[in-house]
Every structure is written in structure tokens, then in C-alpha cells.
Amino acid sequence: MKKLGGNLRTTEFLKECLADALIKLLKEKPIEKITIPEIAKLSSVGRTTYFRNFTSKNEMLTFKLVQLWERWAEDQDLRERKNFSLNNALSFFQFNYSIKNLLELIYERNLQNVVYDAFYIVMMPQLGINVLECYKSRFYSYGLFGLLDEWIKRGFYESPEEMTEFVNHIV
């Protein structure tokens, strides 16, 4: 996914700068009132970078969530980061608890769809995987989103360990 005019690392860094600026602005006002020029100015990244890499502000938030997951999974040395299993359920809930403030902001602004979109990107198998794997990934994406959605709405009342116990009882 190399972009013309720059290497992938630089592009990813600039995309993340844009997403970080959007998150800062979301703390002040709803996404509908945030303009691309505002995001570009705050991030010190040109508007063309936005238009070259994103189709919407929501897509920037989804990108940021995926980046945070990839970075966290790398730091935790997770082997199963593109696939959900009972073995990595605790890691999943620990990760989401670690970005609790961001998730609460996303929900406060009624943008929970970006959380599901990030799940889908992370969990959807690559092309060529058999049909059962596709259905399994979709099943876990929706199921986990439902659990996370409820956990966020309940104010992260339960611990990541308790949430993992719920998953073990449900599945």
C-alpha cells in the first residue's frame, strides 16, 4: 500500500498526525463542525494528505484505532492479533481498557460505528481464506462489538478479567 510521493512509514505517520488532530478537536466540538482545514492546521499536515488517504473523518478515527491495536499487539507480542480466540480474549479487553478515554470520547460523539469498522478491518481474513473463516470472523466481530459496546455504555464497570469470564461463559 505504498503511496506515490512518499514511503509508507511517512504516510502512516502523517495519517496518524491527522487522526490525532481530529481527536483533539472532537474534545471541543462534534465531528460535523470540524473542518478539514482545521484538522490540517492543527496537525501541521497538508490538506492534500487527507484527501489522498481518507474519504471521511470517520475513516481517520478507524485508522487510528487500527494503528493503536497493531502497536499494542506488537508491544504485547500477541501472536493472534488478526483473529479472535478465547486465548486472546483478555488481551482484547485489556487493550480496549487501555484506550478507555478515546472510546468514551467516540461514544460521547455518537461515532461508535468507527469502532466496529476497526474490528472489521483487524479481524476480517485476507482474500483466499475459506468461507467458514469468513463467517467465523464476522460472527466474532459482531459479537465482540456487542460486548464492547455494552461495556463502554456501562462505564467500563467490569474489569477486563471479568469481561473475559463473560466471554468464556457465553461462548
Predicted segments with their positions:
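Residue-level recognition of alpha-helical structural elements
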Residues: 7, 82-85, 108, 133-136, ...
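C-terminal peripheral helix-coil segments that are non-catalytic and often amphipathic
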Residues: 150-171
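An amphipathic alpha-helix adjacent to DNA-recognition modules
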Residues: 12-23, 27, 32-33, 38-44, ...
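N-terminal intrinsically disordered/low-complexity leader segments
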Residues: 1-11
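Amphipathic alpha-helical packing segments from all-alpha helical-bundle domains
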Residues: 107-145, 161, 169
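Phosphate-coordinating loops and pocket residues in cytosolic domains that bind phosphorylated ligands
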Residues: 62, 108, 153
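Helical hydrophobic small-molecule/effector-binding pocket
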Residues: 77-120
